[in-house]
Amino acid sequence: MRKIIQEKLNEGKVLHFSLFDPDKVDLESIYSIALKLVESGTSGFLIGGTLGVSKEKLDSIIEILEDFEVPKIIFPSNVNLITEKADAILFMSLLNSDDIYYITGAQLIAAPIIKKLKLESLPTGYIIVGHGGTAAHVGKARVIPYDNIELIVAYSIMAELFGMDFVYLEAGSGAPEPIRPSVISITKKYLENSKIIVGGGIRNEEIAKELALAGADIIVTGNIIEQNLEKALKIVKEISNIRR
């Protein structure tokens, strides 16, 4: 998956990932929603959520998505959300957590399981900014203010120096505003290899385009897919047409 993602980015594309929260999604409608997202240009599916997620439902969603050629990637909140049915897993460390469990503890428990399942891992530095939402509360994150560019950049550089392939800047599910394009632009200048993933609070194609042009490599939307699919499809189409 890492190679596929990198090849697309090397072509100058900006990628869109659709996030499905197993606790919120309707299994009966997910196939038709996924079909529209793929037809609009989404590059991958992230499956996961912070609360109320069972492995059984995670497996069910991935099985429904099997017909689609785009990657199915686990977006884990804990060690119980690991399945061999996925193509890969975001092997995330919540870098600005005050609880070591979310920095290296859960990862220590998960690592042998991931190895045994031969599941491809995508090393990711997860950094919660601004609103933070449920993920910040559960993960005991020391949330970075939207305008503290210096701290966001420092955490991002740290992720890259740790050898992480991705820096995931997260404003939180349902955030009142997304991470600012100016923050992305400045952060991008300091990263040589790590790719920037941005999620949270992205509600229209205009802000998605601004984030993409500012330097985001992958843009994630989740809530908007559940709340207003037509708007979500516009975002996907806008991103899939961008070349840098």
From Swiss-Prot:
Enzyme Commission number: 2.5.1.41
Cofactors (names): Mg(2+)
GO BP terms, alphabetized: glycerophospholipid biosynthetic process
Subcellular location, principal: cytoplasm
GO molecular function, one term: magnesium ion binding
GO cellular component: cytoplasm
InterPro entries from the UniProt entry: GGGP/HepGP_synthase_I, GGGP/HepGP_synthase_sf, GGGP_HepGP_synthase, GGGP_synth
Catalyzed reaction equations: sn-glycerol 1-phosphate + (2E,6E,10E)-geranylgeranyl diphosphate = sn-3-O-(geranylgeranyl)glycerol 1-phosphate + diphosphate
Sequence positions that bind sn-glycerol 1-phosphate: Y168, L169, E170, A171, G172, S173, G174, G200, G201, G222, N223
Broad EC category: transferase
CDD domains per the UniProt record, alphabetical: PcrB_like (cd02812)
Compartments reported by the entry: Cytoplasm
Keyword Oxidoreductase: no
UniProt record similarity statement: Belongs to the GGGP/HepGP synthase family. Group II subfamily.
Function: Prenyltransferase that catalyzes the transfer of the geranylgeranyl moiety of geranylgeranyl diphosphate (GGPP) to the C3 hydroxyl of sn-glycerol-1-phosphate (G1P). This reaction is the first ether-bond-formation step in the biosynthesis of archaeal membrane lipids.
Protein name: Geranylgeranylglyceryl phosphate synthase
UniProt source species: Sulfurisphaera tokodaii (strain DSM 16993 / JCM 10545 / NBRC 100140 / 7) (Sulfolobus tokodaii)
